[in-house]
């Protein structure tokens, strides 16, 4: 791996996604991508006795599917990189307890999907792991209880709010050739433009996404024309227009090349306010829908920029603003991009 420009890692060895697993809840199952998820549930408890245990079940499902697709067992994995939204990364920690794989716990809020993939790819490229597993998850009810109001409270929300995706995604990464190659990653910087409203994460995260996309273009001397798709994680209906406006004003227009996972996972009639959000939003959309399009040749090169609001309820109560970050990874159809 070599650092190119200021923030972009270009992998010196071919790094591949060997398999991916996704698990999702009932609302995600009923959405436009529902048929693409490997495992789905008809109710939010996922056959468990608490929301937190349900989220844990989702991550275990995604991990198990990713391993099974590649005819692997947990003993074939050298390193697990995982994280979630809950305090102390409790979902990832308990899944790691069960798997007993060497474990790096990671937190980047909703940017964790691409953060884990980027670091896993770097470690595989550097020879520190032959085969790594990257996973993340979120659950609507656990996130609401921790960051906003418990679902039982019935608090009203503004139109700028998003709906946290209930689901999990996991990928196996190695130098073993596969259909999808990971060629580079751009590590984001923390941005904070003074947003304090926990019900408007799209506006808060858009500047971080724009900053990472601009830096990626600068570092690799590229433009949006070099990509079939530039996909943000969960800016949804509020943040997506903002990031396009920022990039256009700064001379890096993305136009119709841009889309957002939070706009793809649900339909407007599903009562999701501005769209989807959460760690699982970018993970389940990318690891199912986007990977399928890459394998089928409908896409050749995609830049996935997972966006995260580093939101702390404690700091918000102390009148602090919300810092945000975005990490990006380039996925290419093996042999398909020039």
UniProtKB/Swiss-Prot annotation:
Kindly state one GO CC term assigned in the UniProt record: plasma membrane
Please report a single Pfam family linked to this protein: SpoVAD
GO terms in the biological process aspect are: sporulation resulting in formation of a cellular spore
Its keywords, alphabetically, are: Sporulation
Q: Which domain of life is it from?
A: Bacteria
Q: Which GO terms describe its molecular function?
A: acyltransferase activity
User: What is the designated name of this protein?
Assistant: Stage V sporulation protein AD
Recorded source organism is Bacillus subtilis (strain 168)
């Amino acid at each position: 791996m070599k650092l190119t420009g200021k923030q972009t890692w270009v992998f010196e060895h071919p790094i591949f996604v060997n398999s991916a697993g996704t698990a999702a809840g009932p609302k995600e199952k009923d959405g436009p991508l529902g048929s693409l998820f490997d495992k789905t549930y008809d109710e939010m408890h996922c056959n468990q006795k608490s929301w937190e245990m349900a989220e844990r079940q989702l991550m275990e499902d995604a991990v198990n599917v990713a391993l099974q697709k590649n005819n692997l067992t947990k003993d074939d994995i050298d390193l697990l990189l995982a994280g979630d939204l809950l305090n102390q990364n409790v979902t990832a920690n308990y899944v790691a307890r069960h798997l007993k794989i060497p474990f790096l716990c990671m937190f980047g809020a909703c940017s964790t999907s691409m953060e884990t993939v980027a670091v896993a790819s770097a470690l595989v490229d550097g020879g520190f792991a032959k085969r790594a597993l990257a996973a993340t998850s979120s659950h609507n009810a656990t996130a609401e209880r921790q960051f906003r109001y418990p679902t039982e409270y019935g608090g009203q929300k503004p139109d700028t709010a998003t709906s946290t995706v209930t689901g999990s995604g996991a990928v196996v990464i190695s130098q073993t050739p596969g259909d999808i190659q990971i060629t580079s990653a751009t590590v984001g910087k923390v941005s904070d433009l003074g947003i304090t409203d926990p019900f408007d994460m799209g506006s808060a995260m858009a500047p971080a996404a724009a900053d990472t996309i601009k830096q990626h273009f600068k570092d690799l001397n590229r433009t949006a024309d070099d990509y079939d798709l530039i996909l943000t994680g969960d800016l949804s209906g509020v943040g997506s227009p903002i990031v396009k406006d920022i990039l256009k004003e700064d001379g890096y227009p993305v136009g119709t090349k841009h889309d957002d996972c939070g706009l793809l996972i649900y339909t407007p009639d599903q009562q999701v306010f501005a769209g989807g959000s959460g760690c699982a939003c970018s993970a389940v959309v990318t690891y199912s829908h986007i990977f399928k399009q890459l394998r089928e040749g409908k896409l050749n090169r995609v830049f996935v920029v997972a966006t995260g609001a580093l939101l702390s309820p404690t700091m918000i109560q102390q009148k602090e603003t919300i810092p945000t970050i975005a990490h990006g990874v380039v996925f290419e159809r093996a042999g398909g991009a020039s």
